[in-house]
Amino acid sequence: MSGTAGSGVGAAGSVGSVVRRFLAEYGSGTSSRLKVLDAYLLYVMLTGALQFGYCLGVGTFPFNSFLSGFISAVGSFILGVCLRIQINPQNKGEFQGISPERAFADFLFANTILHLVVINFVG
C-alpha cells in the first residue's frame, strides 16, 4: 500500500487548489473574445445535456424534433470548438492564412448550413 491511502481531506484540498489556480490563470491569461466563446460553448453543451436528459426522463415522442434539437446542439458545439481553435492566439502558427474574421465568417456559413439541414429534418 502506498502512503497516499490516508484521509480524503488532502486530496480534496489539492483539487481545490488546482481549481483555484485554473480559474486564476484562465481569468488572467485568456482574452475576452475566447471567454465569450467559452460561455457560448457552455450554453450549447448545457442545452444538449438538457435535451438528452429530457429524452431519458420523458421520452422521444416527436422523435424528429428531438433529433433535430440534439443534432443542432452537437453541431453548434463542434463548430464553436473549431472556431475557438482557429482564433486562439496560441494556434496562430497552424492557421497562418486564416484571419479571425475569416474564421468567424466560416463559422457563420457552416452554422447557417447546419440549421437549414436541421429545419429541413424537422419537416
Swiss-Prot record:
Subcellular locations according to the entry: Endoplasmic reticulum membrane
**According to its record, how does it sit in the membrane?**
Multi-pass membrane protein
Keyword Endoplasmic reticulum part of the UniProt annotation: yes
GO CC term (a single one): oligosaccharyltransferase complex
Database matches in InterPro entries: DAD/Ost2
Give the Lumenal membrane side ranges.
62
Print the keywords alphabetically.
Apoptosis, Endoplasmic reticulum, Membrane, Transmembrane, Transmembrane helix
Q: Does the keyword Cell division apply?
A: no
* Stretches assigned to the Cytoplasmic side: 1-40, 84-102
GO terms in the biological process aspect are: apoptotic process; protein N-linked glycosylation
Segments crossing the lipid bilayer: 41-61, 63-83, 103-123
Tell me the domain of life: Eukaryota
- Chief place of localization: endoplasmic reticulum
Question: Pathway, according to UniProt?
Answer: Protein modification; protein glycosylation
Family that this chain belongs to: Belongs to the DAD/OST2 family.
Tell me how this protein assembles.
Component of the oligosaccharyltransferase (OST) complex.
Per its database record, what is this protein's job? Subunit of the oligosaccharyl transferase (OST) complex that catalyzes the initial transfer of a defined glycan (Glc(3)Man(9)GlcNAc(2) in eukaryotes) from the lipid carrier dolichol-pyrophosphate to an asparagine residue within an Asn-X-Ser/Thr consensus motif in nascent polypeptide chains, the first step in protein N-glycosylation. N-glycosylation occurs cotranslationally and the complex associates with the Sec61 complex at the channel-forming translocon complex that mediates protein translocation across the endoplasmic reticulum (ER). All subunits are required for a maximal enzyme activity.
List the protein's name: Dolichyl-diphosphooligosaccharide--protein glycosyltransferase subunit DAD1
Specify the species.
Gallus gallus
Native organism taxonomy: Eukaryota, Metazoa, Chordata, Craniata, Vertebrata
